[in-house]
């Protein structure tokens, strides 16, 4: 489970453990990942793996690490993702654009391509990629984020077609507005107008 240090991925991790699964919890943030394992109190059923999903080499090394700790890989639940600074395209720096695509697009591609052979070798496997409703309709100030999630959507749908007739199932999930730490994790602040600010004070 990627992004397991917070949000949807933390909830998925805890629920999977509650149901008796063994989970490899993946995140960039060591502190929040440790918080998840503390909440889990899973007595060895969860292993933690700290890495940057935008870096291909560590991702390619991940299956062997997970198998060494867990024995096998039967599923990938890819939740990790970030948003962009709330700004129009013309006002965005290329660094911000590239960072969103590095995590949301390349991270997804690296994980899916790396874990697919492991899953095809199992009796049954499942890939779940978390996209976003923002991949269907534009969200104000999130054009690049939406484009990255639209790419995740199409990749997942294409992989679903490619895996038809195999032992691997592929699913895309499209959350709407969910209370998570994505703004903090993305190092982004949400702009609020003066009236909203006054109402909050």
Where are these regions (language model features)?
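The beta1-alpha1 cofactor-binding region of Rossmann-like NAD(H)/NADP(H)-dependent oxidoreductases
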Residues: 31, 50-61, 94
């Amino acid at each position: 489970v990627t992004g397991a240090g917070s949000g949807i991925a933390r909830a998925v991790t805890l629920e999977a453990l509650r149901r008796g699964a063994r989970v490899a919890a993946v995140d960039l943030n060591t502190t929040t990942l440790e918080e998840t394992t503390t909440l889990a109190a899973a007595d060895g059923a969860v292993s933690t793996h700290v890495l940057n999903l935008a870096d291909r080499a560590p991702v390619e090394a991940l299956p062997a690490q997970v198998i060494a700790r867990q024995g096998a890989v039967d599923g990938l639940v890819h939740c990790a993702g970030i948003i962009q600074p709330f700004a129009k395209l013309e006002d965005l720096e290329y660094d911000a654009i590239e960072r969103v695509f590095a995590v949301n697009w390349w991270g997804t591609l690296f994980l899916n391509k790396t874990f697919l052979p492991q899953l095809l070798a199992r009796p049954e496997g499942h890939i779940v990629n978390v996209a976003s409703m923002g991949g269907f309709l534009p969200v104000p100030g999130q054009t690049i984020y939406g484009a990255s999630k639209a790419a995740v959507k199409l990749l997942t749908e294409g992989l679903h077609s490619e895996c038809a007739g195999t032992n691997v199932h592929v699913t895309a999930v499209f959350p709407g507005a969910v209370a998570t730490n994505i703004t903090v994790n993305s190092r982004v602040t949400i702009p609020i107008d003066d009236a909203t600010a006054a109402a909050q004070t």
